[in-house]
């Protein structure tokens, strides 16, 4: 990393790395999609979508894999149906898991009359440019996934769990997948209803649900 980005390494080392201000002119202008692999060693992969302006969580799901394009497409279609429309633009990282998603988004925006219609309705970005969802994963790691990691590690240290044993991993999924999804649902509800404070990195502040459903109240 030092060879490819020496300036960035030095900035991180001294705490001088500056985040960009995020600006979005409308509630459904963009959705940002990505996965979280912190619990993947235990067989639980998390996938999420965040609304650009409000930082509202659109979905937060646990599955065996967050690389299955059909599953991700299903999350997307379900959310589009619930929102009665698709975002103007969709941002994802480049990967085979996002291929179906990209095609669907561009198809849904085929008849759009704005600059992001059709093939421009989806854009592949690096994780460093997908800052809203990456920012949320950072919060999620601190607030929730670290608890689950410690919880499962206690099983390992007590020799209760052997991750090389298929019976153990399947039993772990059977016992905890629904509990973890229930926890994610609660995390989603809390996040969407809590107030985001003013920040020099954001143009608006307030509860994500309020900013999403009543964007006109936030300028």
Predicted features and spans:
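Long, compositionally biased intrinsically disordered regions
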Residues: 189-219
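RNase H-like DDE/DDD metal-dependent nuclease/strand-transfer catalytic core used by mobile genetic elements
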Residues: 2-13, 18-192, 196-201
């Amino acid at each position: 990393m030092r060879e490819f980005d020496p300036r960035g390494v030095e900035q991180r080392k001294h705490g001088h790395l500056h985040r960009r201000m995020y600006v979005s002119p409308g509630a459904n202008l963009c959705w940002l999609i990505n996965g979280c692999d912190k619990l993947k060693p235990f067989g639980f992969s998390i996938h999420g979508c965040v609304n650009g302006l409000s930082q509202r969580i659109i979905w937060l799901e646990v599955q065996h894999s967050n690389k299955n394009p059909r599953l991700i497409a299903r999350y997307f279609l379900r959310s589009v149906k619930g929102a009665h429309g698709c975002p103007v633009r969709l941002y994802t990282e480049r990967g085979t898991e996002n291929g179906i998603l990209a095609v669907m988004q561009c198809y849904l925006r085929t008849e759009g009359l704005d600059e992001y219609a059709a093939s421009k309705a989806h854009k592949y970005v690096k994780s460093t440019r997908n800052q809203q969802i990456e920012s949320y994963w950072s919060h999620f790691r601190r607030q929730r996934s670290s608890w689950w990691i410690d919880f499962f590690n206690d099983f390992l240290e007590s020799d209760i769990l052997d991750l090389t044993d298929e019976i153990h991993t399947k039993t772990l999924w059977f016992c905890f997948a629904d509990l973890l999804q229930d926890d994610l649902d609660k995390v989603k509800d809390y996040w969407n209803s809590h107030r985001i404070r003013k920040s020099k990195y954001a143009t608006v502040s307030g509860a994500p649900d309020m900013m999403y459903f009543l964007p006109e109240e936030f300028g």
